Amino acid sequence: MTTTRFAPSPTGYIHIGNLRTALMNYLIARKAGGTFILRIDDTDPERSKEEYVDGIKQDLEWLGLHWDRIERQSLRLDRYAQAADKLRDMGRFYEAFETPTELDLKRKKQLNMGKPPVYDRAALELSDAEKDALRAERGAGVWRFKLERERIEWADGILGDISIDAASVSDPVLIRGDGQILYTLASVVDDTEMGVTNVVRGSDHVTNTATQIQIINALGGTVPDFAHHSLLTGPQGEALSKRLGTLALRDLRENGVQPAALLSLMARLGSSDPVELQTDMADLIEGFDISRFGSAPTKFDADDLYPLTARYLAGLPLADVAGDLSAAGVPDDMAAQFWDVTRENITTLKDIGPWWTLMRDGAEPQIDDEDREFVAEALALLPDGPFDATTWGTWTAAVKEKTGRKGRALFMPLRKALTGQSHGPDMSGLMPLLQVVKARR
């Protein structure tokens, strides 16, 4: 059975980069009729917070990305300890005591000599007495996994054939000096024991994948199918990492972005398929193909979410927005007419309030100097309210006959005088809802 996972750290809220990983893994599992696991990577007790765990769940539920089961790494520490013991017994796990300063000096020396900055395995040469002395002086050391100096190869679902020389990679630290289990080990143990068959994550994990493949093999596990998607950049190709804090899903939600818009964009962004609004999750699942994604950095522009949101809202029936209309103050007996008139002119649900305020209270007129005399003459011909569906046509016909204006020169100044805007709903539909004309004052 196909099994995928999304493994966020509860050290913050889900941002757009996290979503891309979560969505790809979700769609793969659902398309194959498999299992999607939400795995909370909470092995760092100082940074992990329960409020972020709750936030992760809320964001995924808002998007409709429902998991089949949830796991927490903090409840599996004994499993990681057992794996570490196994690696020690195999001679593949060793303690190292260098300080960050010492490691930095080693790296600089290697670079100056034209060599790759790879850990020199000096700790393997320490005697038991030397280790005891270092522990007494510095405390417990870190634990490194001893890589086999060979090429590590796999067929990547996005990047194609990958080959990495392990001799160019430092033996990874799997356990910190304070005993904290790091992601590299915990992830391997979990993926193996949970039967994860497919792992999709960012291309910044490629080297990490190489080391994890060796750890999986050492522990007797089955290597899953890996795929590494490109990293997101800003619309001009700039690094997105510094902006991710402003691209949290809950912030986009607060700004009015709809789940369908977010999912439609992120399911296709970076692939050879065009971005199309999909309102049915089943269609997203059926149309997803990991092989259609490319390796080039993918430009993300949050502004692209709003046209999709607008198209989604325009297609909603009254029943789906009745609560939002009521909250904005639209009377129930006017809701159907209001929604029919405004639905094509709303980008987010936040636009409902301003449109209703305009219709209820009127708008400050926008009148160009060259149109003042014309507008005054036209307003003198505007009948008293209440208006109906024929008012606009009858009024503009009378104004045309009186002034000789026609086309845009006739309609635009009148629209701006009544609504304060140069664009908006069809005026024939809007007039019956317009209760105040401030331009008359």
Swiss-Prot record:
Domain of life: Bacteria
Record-level GO cellular component terms: cytosol
Main location: cytoplasm
EC number: 6.1.1.17
Catalytic reaction(s) noted: tRNA(Glu) + L-glutamate + ATP = L-glutamyl-tRNA(Glu) + AMP + diphosphate
InterPro entries recorded: aa-tRNA-synth_I_cd-bd, aa-tRNA-synth_I_codon-bd_sub2, aa-tRNA-synth_I_CS, aa_tRNA-synth_I_cd-bd_sf, Glu-tRNA-ligase_bac/mito, Glu/Gln-tRNA-synth, Glu/Gln-tRNA-synth_Ib_cat-dom, GluQ/Sye
Top-level EC class as recorded in UniProt: ligase
PROSITE patterns documented for this protein: AA_TRNA_LIGASE_I
Molecular function terms from GO: ATP binding; glutamate-tRNA ligase activity; tRNA binding
Keywords: Aminoacyl-tRNA synthetase, ATP-binding, Cytoplasm, Ligase, Nucleotide-binding, Protein biosynthesis
Pfam families reported in the protein's UniProt record: Anticodon_2, tRNA-synt_1c
Motif ('KMSKS' region): 239-243
Residues reported in the UniProt entry to bind ATP: K242
Sequence motif 'HIGH' region, location on chain: 8-18
Gene3D superfamilies xrefs: 1.10.10.350, HUPs
Subcellular location: Cytoplasm
GO biological process terms held by the UniProt record: glutamyl-tRNA aminoacylation
Reported function: Catalyzes the attachment of glutamate to tRNA(Glu) in a two-step reaction: glutamate is first activated by ATP to form Glu-AMP and then transferred to the acceptor end of tRNA(Glu).
Subunit and partners: Monomer.
HAMAP family according to UniProt: Glu_tRNA_synth_type1 (MF_00022)
UniProt similarity note: Belongs to the class-I aminoacyl-tRNA synthetase family. Glutamate--tRNA ligase type 1 subfamily.
Protein name: Glutamate--tRNA ligase 1
Underlying gene: gltX1
